[in-house]
Amino acid sequence: MAETRKTRPVSWIKAALKDFREFPEGAKGILLGALTIAAEGGKADIAKPLHGLGSGVLEIALAHRGDAFRIVYAILLADEIWVIHAFQKKS
């Protein structure tokens, strides 16, 4: 019998989703792909732990067409992923 993979739900803080929607389409696609990997229990190559914020808090960092985009997400004990911040890095 084939093994079924459990995909964690991804929830968004309202402000993070609003900011994410302003990202260019190409950047959104790549970042959503990285979030999908996290939801399936993996870690994308462009994701790294954010030290000092507790275990399970990670940042997805993307350089896209000369700009830098970030998503910060947390994996909760209830096996949920929460996107808590999305922003375009200015410097």
Which residues make up each language-model segment?
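Basic, Lys/Arg-enriched alpha-helical interface segments
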Residues: 1-68, 77-81, 88-91
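Hydrophobic/aromatic beta-strand elements that line small-molecule binding cavities or substrate pockets
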Residues: 71-73
